[in-house]
A protein has these predicted regions:
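Exposed aromatic-hydrophobic patches
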Residues: 46-49, 82-100
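Bacterial N-terminal signal peptides
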Residues: 9-19
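C-terminal membrane-anchoring or membrane-association module
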Residues: 376-397
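Short acidic/polar inter-strand loop motif in beta-rich domains
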Residues: 108, 113-124
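Solvent-exposed serine/threonine-rich low-complexity stretches and specific carbohydrate-binding patches
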Residues: 73-83
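Short, surface-exposed binding/anchoring microloops in extracellular/periplasmic proteins
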Residues: 26-60, 64, 174
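Mature extracytoplasmic or organellar-lumen-exposed domains after removal of signal/transit peptides
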Residues: 98, 111, 129-333
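Ser/Thr-rich, Proline-interspersed low-complexity disordered segments
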Residues: 20-25, 329-370
Length: 397
């Protein structure tokens, strides 16, 4: 092969390799998922890749931010491992841990570059990654995962456990009237006060019952899916598993009414109660319907336990490079006055500030290297052309 052809091939190879190198250097993906450690939703785990190394003398620090931007909780300094990855967990052993419910108390997350050493009390450096859970989504996520300290997902599990306890007491007795009393209590817990089989003489139940909590989770998750594309997959799983829990609970209720309350033979009652207790356990833990060795978030399998974990997943932060838009304090709506001559004060206009530029992801020398590679490739192409032309003239001469 002639020298000219070799030079031209090298130039083409340089041009083809250049875009791949740039794309690799700029790729970033990151999530921060909330889970239980010592308390409900008190821990968050970061999984990041394609992370740019912090500037000399600085470190990356995570911050959870409240809805009103007033409270900022440091999740600690992060170490960028080889391969530009970060794996970091904030939990009960971390500095600054209080056991607070992170879903209930926060809705935004930023990662900033801070001076190396002690983590400051509040973020002061440049924001390099961020995510804000949409306002319309966070309220419904909390309704399922954390409202009132528990949310409908935990309330569902609590009520199912109470129903199982009553049925277990019914099975433990040999007195027919006591069996029926405990069974009625279980039915009341499942149906709630508005149920067609509810009987207050056997025990008043506060709240909305198992079926009510399951439906509340279904309804809230549907609104989450409509409000946030990032949370839709988890919201769909909440709906599937809550529907499964509701179906199992309804079956337990129906069998309690049709089998337990109508039976007078104690031996047969024991069989029926064992069956109903098993169905309630399905409503809690789910059922391996296809016998594949696992209980998944699919129709007929996963139930209340998976409602809760998928509710937490709806609150996962899917980080983006750069800083978020500046926080704007909501303007209060003026209250109408009965005095006709009163002139409402004009609402102050918030002047938007420029959004900070996103961080440089990858090595800072990438743009310079790209220009140098382009110049080298052009030089090789021109040089190869000159050599090729010279060889042809020499051959023709």
């Amino acid at each position: 092969m002639s020298k000219a052809r070799v030079i031209i091939l090298l130039a083409l190879a340089s041009l083809l390799a250049l875009p791949m190198g740039i794309a690799t250097a700029n790729h970033f993906e990151g999530t921060a998922a909330i889970s239980d450690d010592k308390a409900a939703s008190d821990s968050i785990t970061f999984s990041l890749k394609g992370v740019h190394a912090p500037s000399a003398g600085t470190q990356l620090v995570g911050w959870l931010i409240s809805d009103d931007d007033a409270t900022k909780l440091s999740t600690g300094a992060m170490t960028v491992a080889s391969g530009d990855t970060v794996s970091h967990t904030f939990g009960s052993s971390s500095t600054g841990y209080t056991g607070a419910n992170l879903i209930q108390n926060f809705s935004s997350l930023v990662i900033t570059e801070e001076p190396s050493g002690a983590v400051p009390a509040a973020p002061s450096g440049a924001t390099v990654y961020h995510y804000d859970i949409p306002t319309a989504a966070i309220a419904q996520i909390r309704a399922v995962a954390s409202a009132g300290g528990t949310g409908s997902a935990q309330d569902l599990k609590t009520q199912l456990a109470a129903a199982k306890s009553e049925l277990t007491l019914a099975r433990a007795t040999t007195t027919l009237d006591i069996v029926r009393t405990h069974t009625h209590k279980a039915i009341n817990i499942i149906e709630g006060p508005t149920g067609s089989n509810y009987n207050a003489t056997h025990g008043v139940v506060e709240g909305i019952g198992v079926l009510g909590h399951a439906q509340a989770a279904i309804d809230a998750a549907a609104l989450v899916g409509a409000a946030s594309a990032d949370a839709k997959a988890a919201a769909d799983l909440v709906q599937i598993t809550a529907k499964n829990a509701k179906t199992f609970a309804e079956l337990a209720r129906d069998r309690s009414v049709s089998l337990v309350l109508t039976e007078t033979n104690l031996a047969q009652l024991d069989i029926h109660l064992a069956n109903v207790i098993g169905v309630v356990e399905n409503a809690i833990s789910g059922l391996d319907a296809n016998a594949d060795g696992s209980i998944g978030a699919v129709d007929g399998e996963g139930a209340a336990n998976l409602v809760y974990t998928n509710a937490q997943a709806m609150g996962t932060y899917k980080l983006k490079a750069g800083a978020p838009p500046p926080f704007i304090v909501p303007t209060a709506v003026p209250t109408a006055t009965a005095v006709p001559t009163a002139t409402p004060a004009p609402t102050p206009v918030v002047v938007p500030t420029a959004t900070p530029a996103p961080p440089v992801v990858g090595a800072s020398s990438v743009p310079l290297m790209a220009h140098m590679a382009l110049l080298a490739a052009l030089a090789l192409l021109i040089g190869g052309g000159v050599v090729l032309l010279s060889e042809r003239r020499r051959t023709q001469g």
